């Protein structure tokens, strides 16, 4: 069987399983099975598909038909132009989270704290973009911290990033220039409506704090003033309907210059605030 024939058969199979981007996902999984760069797949479609590659492709298709995310199947996800290892112990880095990176890089910083780091994509990216900066990244999951450590090492920032097992600020006595977080923010009653890729395959600890979805923001807002240097910034990713509530929590904690920033689709995506300089 040629690779092209395997791809042609795979697309309707994934579509029948409810995969919206069946052709895109089939191509990515075939490239993974053939151990080639996805950008070069078209050049190899006329090639015979070796039995071992065919077996890998079949296993990958079965996993995707069961709605496992492509990133988990291939073991990596692109974020800000870099490849990050992902597992079932971490959320896949989302394109919308790149808005946090863009906002963070708009001003200088020497020290950064990433709360609930997961894959480490936020902290690692910021340190890779700012070679003189140092950071701390926390998570409640030892397994997630292990993934973050792999990514920090692979992308050359391990010597400048300290990973800590911590419930938000519990293991962080320091003050920093910049605090960021993409915390769990799905309300308990919204979990059932999530896509199967998220609801069935990603860690619920990283998705929802339970209740109204705001508990993580309450904890971060309470702790941020004691962990920011004067003039330091807080950047939080939020759900589309949470802008007013999260901004209110941050203002009540004593931070200033609080604003809600939209994503490229015009939906509320970030809350930005600053500790007064004096």
Swiss-Prot record:
Gene3D superfamilies hit by this protein: DNA helicase RuvA subunit, C-terminal domain, Vaccinia Virus protein VP39
Binding site for substrate: 182-185
NCBIfam families for this protein: hemK_fam, RF_mod_PrmC
Protein name (database record): Release factor glutamine methyltransferase
PANTHER family, alphabetized: HEMK METHYLTRANSFERASE, MTRF1L RELEASE FACTOR GLUTAMINE METHYLTRANSFERASE
Similarity-based family: Belongs to the protein N5-glutamine methyltransferase family. PrmC subfamily.
S-adenosyl-L-methionine listed as a keyword: yes
Any single biological process term in GO: methylation
Function noted in UniProt: Methylates the class 1 translation termination release factors RF1/PrfA and RF2/PrfB on the glutamine residue of the universally conserved GGQ motif.
EC number: 2.1.1.297
Enzyme class: transferase
Alphabetically ordered keywords of this record: Methyltransferase, S-adenosyl-L-methionine, Transferase
Residue positions binding S-adenosyl-L-methionine: 116-120, 139, 168, 182
Catalysis performed (reactions): L-glutaminyl-[peptide chain release factor] + S-adenosyl-L-methionine = N(5)-methyl-L-glutaminyl-[peptide chain release factor] + S-adenosyl-L-homocysteine + H(+)
Gene Ontology molecular functions: nucleic acid binding; protein-(glutamine-N5) methyltransferase activity; protein-glutamine N-methyltransferase activity
């Amino acid at each position: 069987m040629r690779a092209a024939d395997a791809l042609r058969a795979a697309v309707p199979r994934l579509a029948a399983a409810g995969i919206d981007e069946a052709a895109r996902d089939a191509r990515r999984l075939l490239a993974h099975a053939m151990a080639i760069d996805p950008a070069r797949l078209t050049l190899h479609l006329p090639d015979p598909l070796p039995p071992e590659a065919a077996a890998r492709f079949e296993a990958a298709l079965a996993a995707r038909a069961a709605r496992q995310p492509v990133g988990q199947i291939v073991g990596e996800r692109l974020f800000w132009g870099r490849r990050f290892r992902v597992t079932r112990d971490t959320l896949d880095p989302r394109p919308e989270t790149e808005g946090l990176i863009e906002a963070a890089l708009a001003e200088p910083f020497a020290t950064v704290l990433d709360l609930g780091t997961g894959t480490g994509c936020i902290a690692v990216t910021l340190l890779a973009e700012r070679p003189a900066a140092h950071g701390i990244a926390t998570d409640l999951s030892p397994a997630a911290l292990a993934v973050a450590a792999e990514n920090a090492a692979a992308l050359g920032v391990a010597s400048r990033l300290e990973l800590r097992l911590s419930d938000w600020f519990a293991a962080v006595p320091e003050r920093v220039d910049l605090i960021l977080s993409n915390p769990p923010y799905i309300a308990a009653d919204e979990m059932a409506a999530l896509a199967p890729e998220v609801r069935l395959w990603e860690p619920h600890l990283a998705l929802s704090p339970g209740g109204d979805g705001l508990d993580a923001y309450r904890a971060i807002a309470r702790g941020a003033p004691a962990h920011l240097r004067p003039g330091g910034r807080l950047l939080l990713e939020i759900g589309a309907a949470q802008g007013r509530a999260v901004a209110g929590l941050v203002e009540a904690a004593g931070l200033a210059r609080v604003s809600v920033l939209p994503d490229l689709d015009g939906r509320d995506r970030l809350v930005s605030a600053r500790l007064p300089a004096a």
